[in-house]
Amino acid sequence: MDSASSNTKAIDPPLHMLGFEFDELSPTRITGRLPVSPVCCQPFKVLHGGVSALIAESLASMGAHMASGFKRVAGIQLSINHLKSADLGDLVFAEATPVSTGKTIQVWEVKLWKTTQKDKANKILISSSRVTLICNLPIPDNAKDAANMLKMVAKL
């Protein structure tokens, strides 16, 4: 298992199960990629919209968690526009950036682009999302060490 894959498994098991790998982890930018495989497609052999939504909320939550000083965060609203489809075999790139990082509420923008394995330079926007998160929640006792792996992987 390569380092990017093992990092994804450690910090976001659901995304790991789909084949997602993180590239950059910081309080101001989260990026990664997903090869569109049968496990993340709907019956028409295109990326399932729910997978795009999962990526959006996961990346925004991770960024908000870091930007809030590793406080507990929770998504309270997700809006996603599916603009184009990504076909089986395409490669999807994801980027989450903060729009607003307040002490209580954060808003993150998440964009997904597709490329083909043959032409990685030609990126086409497939979805655009806004994720609103509450970011001042208490951390329960059973999750006190939840941020440790993310801090280690992000080298923070």
Curated annotation (Swiss-Prot):
- Distribution of this protein across tissues and organs: Mostly expressed in roots, stems, leaves and siliques.
> When this gene is knocked out, what is seen?
Reduced DHNA-CoA thioesterase activity and phylloquinone content.
- Family according to the record: Belongs to the 4-hydroxybenzoyl-CoA thioesterase family. DHNA-CoA hydrolase subfamily.
- SUPFAM superfamilies named among the record's database cross-references: Thioesterase/thiol ester dehydrase-isomerase
Q: Name one GO biological process term.
A: phylloquinone biosynthetic process
Active-site residues from the entry? E57
Q: Which InterPro entries match?
A: HotDog_dom_sf, PAAI_dom, Thioestr_dom
Q: Which Gene3D superfamilies match?
A: Hotdog Thioesterase
Q: What is its main location?
A: other
What are the protein's GO molecular function terms? hydrolase activity
Keywords, in A-Z order = Hydrolase, Peroxisome
What is the documented function of this protein?
Answer: Catalyzes the hydrolysis of the thioester bond of 1,4-dihydroxy-2-naphthoyl-CoA (DHNA-CoA) in peroxisomes, a necessary step to form the naphthoquinone ring of phylloquinone (vitamin K(1)). Is not active on benzoyl-CoA, phenylacetyl-CoA, succinyl-CoA and palmitoyl-CoA thioesters.
Keyword field contains Transcription: no
Query: What does the annotation say about its assembly with partners?
Result: Homotetramers.
- Asked whether the keyword Hydrolase is assigned, the reply is yes
Query: This chain belongs to which protein, by name?
Result: 1,4-dihydroxy-2-naphthoyl-CoA thioesterase 1
Task: Write down the EC number.
Answer: 3.1.2.-
Give, as one word, the top-level EC class.
Answer: hydrolase
Miscellaneous note, as given in the UniProt record, is: May originate from a horizontal gene transfer with a bacterial species of the Lactobacillales order.
- Pathway as given in its UniProt record: Cofactor biosynthesis; phylloquinone biosynthesis; Quinol/quinone metabolism; 1,4-dihydroxy-2-naphthoate biosynthesis; 1,4-dihydroxy-2-naphthoate from chorismate: step 7/7
Q: Localized where?
A: Peroxisome
What organism is recorded for this protein?
Arabidopsis thaliana
Coiled-coil ranges (or none): none
The UniProt entry's GO CC annotations, sorted and at most eight, read:
peroxisome
This protein's encoding gene = DHNAT1
**Organism superkingdom:** Eukaryota
